[in-house]
Each structure stands twice: as C-alpha cells, then as structure tokens.
Amino acid sequence: MFKGSIPALITPFTDNGSVDEKAFAAHVEWQIAEGSNGLVPVGTTGESPTLSHDEHKRVVELCIEVAAKRVPVIAGAGSNNTDEAIELALHAQEAGADALLVVTPYYNKPTQKGLFAHFSAVAEAVKLPIVIYNIPPRSVVDMSPETMGALVKAHKNIIGVKDATGKLDRVSEQRISCGKDFVQLSGEDGTALGFNAHGGVGCISVTANVAPRLCSEFQAAMLAGDYAKALEYQDRLMPLHRAIFMEPGVCGTKYALSKTRGGNRRVRSPLMSTLEPATEAAIDAALKHAGLMN
C-alpha cells in the first residue's frame, strides 16, 4: 500500500513567520517530479508543534490539492489529546488524504492500555488507513509490539507503523505480532538500509526533503533486492543523514535546502534558524559528498 521513499515534508515560512504556501506547493511539486513515492505533511519535520490548528489543516489541504492523487498523502494527525487527534484525523479524511500518521501521545506518558485506548478511539472515528508513529526519543513512550499487534487485530484500518525506535529487531517482532502484511516504514534515514533488510518496505524520510531522487533510487534498489546498489547510495547519503541532525529539529534540513534550492531557513521558536559554523560546514561537506552541491 505504502512503500519506498516518503518525505516527511518541511513547512516553509516567509520572512514574517507565516506559512509560505507558494513555497510549500513548489516543494511538493519538486518532490513528486524527483520520484518520491508519497508525502507526509505536518509531521515532526513539518514543525507541527508550532503550527496553529488552522495552519495545520491548511497545510494538509494544500498538500492534497497539489499532489492531486499522483502520490499518496499520509497526513499528520497526531496529538497527546485524544479528542484533538480525532479532530485532526476527521479533517484530513474530509480533505481527501489517503492515510493518517498518528504519533504516540507525547509528554503525558500513557500506559500500554492508554495507548491502545487512544489509537482505538482514532481508528473508530475514521475510515482511513492509520500508520502508527512510534518515536520514543520524542514522545517518551514506546508502544510495544504486543500492543501494536492487539491494535491491528482490533482495527482493520490500522495498517502500518513509522518506526523511529532505532531498534532493528523491532521489524521482526512487529511482523510476528502484526502479520506479514503490516506495512513497516523506517523513521530513521541512517538505519533504513538495515530496516528494509529486516522486512521493512520504505522510509518516511527527512533527508528526502533535500535529496528526493537519491532517496527514491535508494529505496527502489532495496525493494528490487539489489542491496549492493543500495549500499552505494547509503554511503553517498550517510554524511547528510548525520549532518542535518547535528543540531536538533529541522534547522539543518532547511539550511541544506537554502544551499541547494534557495529556500528560506526560517523555523519557529523555540527552534533556532541559525546554526553553529561547524554544523553549516558539515552540511556543506555532506551536500558535496552526495553530489548535491559543487
């Protein structure tokens, strides 16, 4: 259903801090032209925590409008408030999204039973396929493979996971708990090669914002079983995977885009639009290593 390279899209801002709809639409068009296999608006990389509800909904709508069914749109619809998650999910469904990305509730640290109840409530409120977003480093809660399996058995529209645990053995554990048809997408660019080798089928990628064609070709090689070719792409992309996260958040990604495509580097507070000189130098070197900048 969903596979390959699926960028977790940035949300561009203007100099005055508002959402730059023209730049976002152009970014979506470029992603599709470069071979991306799907799109995820308003996830972590889209700075969803600092978007208003109206902005969140508008970015989802715009992504769907521009994509025009050429590639699937998996709309970010997560919250640590169950009612709010349902509201965002219903809006994405009405707007025409193809699926939902629903993050595990962050900060309030629900139990496994609480996670089951939260995702069950969202699944029962919508008809769209749901991809669970499990990211313990940010949400401070880790959905177990057993809870995931119970959700899959209880709700036919819970169909996959974006796994950002960094634990490659989870792919096998989740396949056992959730079944062979459960869609497993890596949430970490650097470990996507190993993730697919364990049975994953793609990556919801940050680096694909900057290198969509390379990331798409990397995933295509793996899905074709050509791991020797995939390893060449891995070596070409790995410095970039690392460099854009030398400082937290999406600042590094937006800096890289400013160098390759002239994008606005602005992020919303409390993130910082400026980077340390050493970070900029590392990103520049990584872009050159990947063949994306002279």
From Swiss-Prot:
Principal place of residence: cytoplasm
Subcellular location: Cytoplasm
SMART domains per the UniProt record, alphabetical: DHDPS (SM01130)
Gene Ontology MF annotations: 4-hydroxy-tetrahydrodipicolinate synthase activity
Disulphide bridges, residue numbers: none
Keyword Aminoacyl-tRNA synthetase assigned: no
GO cellular component: cytosol
PROSITE patterns for this protein: DHDPS_1, DHDPS_2
Residues spanning the membrane: none
UniProt-listed Enzyme Commission number(s): 4.3.3.7
Family: Belongs to the DapA family.
Entry function: Catalyzes the condensation of (S)-aspartate-beta-semialdehyde [(S)-ASA] and pyruvate to 4-hydroxy-tetrahydrodipicolinate (HTPA).
Name of this protein: 4-hydroxy-tetrahydrodipicolinate synthase
Species whose genome carries this gene: Agrobacterium fabrum (strain C58 / ATCC 33970) (Agrobacterium tumefaciens (strain C58))
Lineage, uppermost ranks: Bacteria, Pseudomonadati, Pseudomonadota, Alphaproteobacteria, Hyphomicrobiales
Gene encoding the protein: dapA
